[in-house]
Curated annotation (Swiss-Prot):
One of its GO terms (cellular component) is periplasmic side of cell outer membrane. Residues 258-343 are annotated as: Disordered. Transmembrane segments: none annotated. The gene is lpoA. Residues 268-281, 290-301 have a biased composition (Polar residues). It is found in: Cell outer membrane. The lineage of its organism: Bacteria, Pseudomonadati, Pseudomonadota, Gammaproteobacteria, Enterobacterales. It comes from Sodalis glossinidius (strain morsitans). Regulator of peptidoglycan synthesis that is essential for the function of penicillin-binding protein 1A (PBP1a). Keywords: Cell outer membrane, Cell shape, Lipoprotein, Membrane, Palmitate, Peptidoglycan synthesis, Signal. This is Penicillin-binding protein activator LpoA. Interacts with PBP1a.
């Protein structure tokens, strides 16, 4: 006999999707036929068969057919119909469950809620913990509980809980002390020990989540010397020069001086446009090759293509590292800023990766006393760090901040990856749009490899955030867009799925994310966000075509990447972009206007090089916080290219600034 349980929390909340997991857990344990007290029911028929039998059956067997129908509907991707059947099932009290059933129930509830972090999912893990006997399963439960907690949206973590939920209160207090102290490892270590004393009955007090165990084992390390590995000749030279100048300016404290001057001038009500300029190249010594430190400054129309040079980034569109107890140059939000407050005496040497093989340069850097490597820049050189045995041997135990990210990442305990990639920006956009409550995004992308990469990155991040299908539409050249305008065809707000989303496994059954292959339009209430990857010229053609398709009362929100940002655009362009949100690095969105004025003049308005200069500034900050980025989960640096944090594999993520065009002005997006 098949059993059905629709369980109710004592707070009265229903979890109908949980029942689906219970159904699957029950049904997958059945043989080819499910034996009831009346007749054998085939367990692998289609949903329509079960629904028909359900209508013709008595109450004793009707529920069995209904359970199997729901299971079949889910397998067939007919989720709305499955949800209707779930809602029709009878509720019973969870107190009637025995221990094995409670374990199956809690696991089902976890499986059903994994795609969207919530307090109810945390409660499910808490309910499961005392039912587990295997030590490895207990540790996994603790780690998953913590992972869910740190992923909770702020409104969820601030909800009022029941007075008798002592274990949940302990977990929330652990989350709070982590968030309050994660920027200072020593304070965090002490706070965790105090928490363990105050909550001795909490499962995590006995066995910490793995990330917090790493915090307890944290050890800081000073930077004895830095080797900057960049291509100083060839097409990528201009990019290297921009990065090197930003790195040197941060090392010498020049960016902090600019910030101080801005604050003083702001307090006095004065402009900072007249701040003296400095090329920021002092303090680095070329080694292993010649270096043109000032470098040629090219106009936007003459510099080489970064992609052709192997540079993957947005260019295409304190004497020691701080100790655990002090973080120099902290921002107002408690995060270390992108530059220490004074010039550093750490020796820095620059090595030319275009003149010598990488193993020779790494060996030379070690002989020269370097303990930290910044670079290499080109993607093929970065891939050598783990693909080439000679390079890997030469790297030894050196800490390495690679200035690019390979296509197929192979994590290494001594390597972090920092890139200004369009994929990174797409992931940030997916999270930003999802946090604004949008449900169905449409990507407007250029045809070709760039569009493919952005589509995959956005879609992956969207699914990870709990979103469903992402739609895409491709466009061609500006000439093709103009032809669409002239012909009256414009842009149709329809799309096809980027790809099948990650399948969800519930109680041993893998359920594909349902896809809608039909045309979807905002009039049908489906598409409520459009993310556009386009140049300023292309965007000036696309935006009016979209405006013609939707009414002024439409909830359709428009977003664009930094590829579309035109800093020197006139008032007409700003008015044309009304309502559009776009992302870019903090330096280009008003974080330090005087510094931006200096750098943009230095690079003759080439904002792609300004972004690489900002990357150099942040590379210096990351070098000074390398231990924290590698060992402290959630550690952040307020950088010029974004708020910087690291994944478990030490890929540096950037949370960007978002602005919005409103009445001809740019304001911070909400």
């Amino acid at each position: 006999m098949l059993y059905s349980y629709v369980l109710v929390f004592k707070t009265g909340r229903l979890l109908p999707v949980v029942l689906a997991s219970l159904i699957l857990a029950a049904c997958t344990a059945q043989g080819p036929e499910s034996q009831t007290g009346h007749a054998a029911i085939p367990a692998n028929a289609n949903a329509d068969y079960y629904l028909q039998q359900m209508q013709q059956s008595s109450n004793d067997t009707k529920t069995d057919y209904q359970l199997l129908a729901i299971r079949a509907l889910i397998k067939e991707g007919r989720l709305p119909q499955a949800q209707q059947q779930l809602a029709a099932l009878q509720q019973i009290d969870s107190a009637s469950l025995d221990a094995p059933q409670r374990l199956r129930y809690t696991q089902a509830m976890i499986n059903a809620g994994q795609s969207r972090p919530s307090l109810d999912l945390v409660r499910a893990y808490i309910a499961q913990a005392p039912l587990l006997t295997d030590p490895a399963a207990r540790q996994q439960n603790i780690d998953k509980t913590w992972q869910t907690l740190v992923s909770l949206p702020s409104p969820q973590s601030n909800l009022v809980i029941n007075a008798d939920e002592n274990i949940l209160q302990g977990w929330l207090d652990l989350l709070r002390i982590y968030q309050d102290n994660r920027q200072d490892p020593t304070l965090l270590q002490a706070a965790i020990k105090d928490w363990q004393t105050r909550y001795p009955q909490n499962p995590a007090a006995k066995t910490l989540p793995t990330p917090l165990s790493q915090v307890q084992n944290y050890s800081s390390s000073s930077v004895g010397g830095i080797a900057l590995l960049l291509p100083l000749n060839g097409q990528a030279q201009v990019f290297s020069n921009a990065i090197q100048q930003g790195f040197s300016a941060a090392k010498n404290g020049l960016t902090t001086q600019q910030s101080a001057l801005e604050q003083d001038a702001s307090a006095a009500g004065q402009s900072t446009d007249g701040v003296p300029q400095n090329d920021g190249t002092a303090g680095t010594e070329p080694a292993g090759g010649s270096a043109n430190q000032n470098g040629p400054v090219t106009t936007p129309g003459t510099r080489p293509d970064p992609a052709a040079s192997g540079v993957d980034g947005q260019a295409s569109a304190a004497d020691n590292a701080p100790q655990a107890t002090t973080l120099s140059g902290q921002s107002a939000g408690g995060q270390p800023s992108a530059a220490p407050s004074a010039a550093s005496g750490v020796p820095v040497k620059v090595y030319d990766t275009s003149s010598q093989p990488l193993p020779a340069l790494l060996a030379q850097a070690q002989r020269d006393g370097a303990s930290m490597i910044i670079g290499p820049l080109l993607k093929n050189d970065v891939e050598q760090l783990y693909n080439d045995n000679a390079v890997a041997a030469s790297a030894g135990t050196l800490n390495i901040l690679a200035l690019n990210q390979p296509e197929h990442l192979q994590p290494r305990p001594n390597i972090c990856y920092f890139a200004l990639s369009p994929e990174d920006e797409a992931r940030d956009a997916a999270n930003h749009i999802h946090q604004q409550g949008r449900q169905q995004p449409l990507l407007l992308l250029p045809r070709g490899a760039l569009g493919d990469r952005i589509a995959k990155a956005f879609s992956d991040a969207w699914h990870q955030a709990g979103g469903a299908t992402v739609l895409e539409q491709r466009f061609g050249s500006s000439a093709e867009l103009k032809q669409n305008i002239n012909s009256g065809s414009g842009i149709s707000l329809t799309g096809t799925p980027v790809a099948a989303g990650a399948a969800v496994t519930i109680a041993g059954l893998t359920i594909p994310v349902p896809q809608d292959n039909g045309a979807v339009s905002p009039s049908g209430g489906a598409i409520d966000a459009v993310y556009i990857i386009a140049t300023p010229v292309e965007l000036a053609l696309i935006k009016p075509m979209i405006d013609m398709r939707v009414s002024s009362r439409s909830r359709l929100a428009l977003y664009a990447s930094s590829r579309s940002y035109q800093a020197d655009a006139g008032p007409d362009y700003s008015l044309e972009m009304e309502g559009l949100e776009f992302s870019d690095i903090p330096l280009l969105t008003g974080a330090h206007p005087a510094l931006l004025s200096q750098i943009s003049a230095q690079f003759r308005g080439d904002y792609s090089l300004v972004r690489l200069y900002a990357m150099g500034i942040d590379a210096w900050a990351l070098a000074n916080h390398f231990s924290e980025m590698r060992q402290i989960p959630g550690f952040q640096v307020a950088g010029e290219t974004g708020t910087l944090s690291a994944t478990p594999d030490c890929v540096i993520n950037r949370t960007l600034s978002w602005l919005k065009y409103q009445r001809g002005q740019m304001i911070a997006a909400q």
